[in-house]
């Protein structure tokens, strides 16, 4: 097996309606790689949002390539969103199990939530990503709205009970936090809402075929096996199950296919200022496509 690291795919090449290769770049030169079958496994699109917990290269490239090649995208609006650290240690996942021990306040010191909040925070501690199914959605909505009002986000402090006698599952998290980030329970932190994993993507059949001959897909680039909510950890199972299916299906598809073309035509597109366009897109997605959406905001986006 030949591994070409540090490359980016620019286009999927088709001949007679079948995917037969890809145009890639190493940043300096363009290369055409021909193939009898191709598997997309490029991940989601979390970094299209200003705040995201995934790496910066998870930007929906695979979905865009597939759409351009003739595939159908499904459930693209379904996004896994959860709290994370704004400071210190930006992009660190906030442990939802600690919600039951927290005092949440706006930057000016005002309480984030009104009224009796203990039962709400207790419920919020039972799930990681945001869900609209439970009353605990009020916690995520309040955090998100606070971030829109003040980019510093929400200040978190922990109860004496947790600091002096933390449950084992919380202690394990803070042991990791101290070793990996140099943080303790005593440190002041600010949190906000972060985009994470995509629950939508390229439509695939059970054998991972996409409807475009020669093209298969697996993992977070795909959609359809998850709804609006996805239990944490199922992305790994998704990748293992459908990754194996994609490999088998791609091998089987190669048996009755002729050799791919030796060359291809590629029409390059120039962009004036990609970084500014991308930053503007991230801000737009953060303001209009996070946990709170409405018709006006989505239309503006």
State where each predicted segment sits:
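General beta-strand structural signal in soluble alpha/beta enzymes
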Residues: 3-6, 40-41, 73-78, 114-115, ...
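An anion/pyrophosphate-binding glycine-rich loop and adjacent beta-alpha core
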Residues: 65, 71-183, 249-251, 255
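Glycine-rich loop(s) and the adjacent beta-strand/alpha-helix scaffold that form part
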Residues: 37-91, 232-249
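Glycine- and aromatic-enriched mobile tails/lids
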Residues: 15-19, 105-121, 197, 203-217, ...
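Core beta-strand elements of the Rossmann-like FAD/NAD(P) dinucleotide-binding domain
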Residues: 28-37, 211-212
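FAD/FMN-dependent oxidoreductases across multiple families
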Residues: 171-215
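Feature captures the FAD/FMN-dependent oxidoreductase FAD-binding
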Residues: 1-26, 31-32
């Amino acid at each position: 097996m030949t591994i070409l690291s540090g490359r980016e795919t620019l286009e999927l090449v088709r001949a007679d309606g079948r995917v037969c290769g890809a145009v890639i770049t190493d940043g300096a030169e363009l290369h055409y790689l021909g193939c009898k079958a191709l598997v997309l496994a490029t991940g989601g699109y979390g970094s299209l949002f200003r705040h995201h917990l995934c790496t910066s290269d998870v930007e929906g490239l695979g979905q865009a390539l597939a759409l351009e090649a003739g595939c159908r995208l499904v459930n693209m609006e379904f996004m896994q969103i959860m709290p994370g650290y704004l400071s210190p240690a930006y992009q660190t996942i906030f442990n939802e199990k600690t919600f039951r021990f927290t005092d949440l306040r706006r930057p000016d010191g005002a309480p984030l939530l009104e009224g009796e909040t203990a039962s709400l925070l207790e419920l919020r501690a039972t799930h990681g990503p945001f869900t609209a199914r439970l009353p605990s959605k009020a916690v995520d909505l309040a955090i998100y709205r606070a971030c829109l009002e003040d980019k510093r986000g929400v200040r978190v402090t922990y109860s004496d009970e947790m600091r002096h006698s933390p449950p084992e599952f919380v202690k394990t998290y803070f042991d990791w936090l101290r070793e990996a980030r140099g943080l303790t329970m005593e440190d002041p932190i600010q949190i906000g809402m972060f985009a994470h994993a995509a629950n939508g993507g390229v439509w695939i059949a059970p054998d991972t075929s996409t409807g475009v001959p020669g093209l298969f897909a697996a993992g977070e680039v795909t959609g359809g096996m998850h709804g609006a909510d996805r239990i944490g950890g199922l992305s790994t199972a998704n990748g293992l199950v459908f990754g194996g299916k994609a490999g088998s299906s791609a091998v089987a598809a190669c048996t009755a296919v002729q050799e791919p073309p030796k060359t291809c035509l590629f029409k390059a597109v120039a962009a004036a200022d990609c970084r500014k366009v991308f930053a503007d897109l991230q801000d737009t997605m953060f303001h209009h496509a996070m946990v709170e959406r409405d018709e006006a905001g989505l239309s503006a986006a």
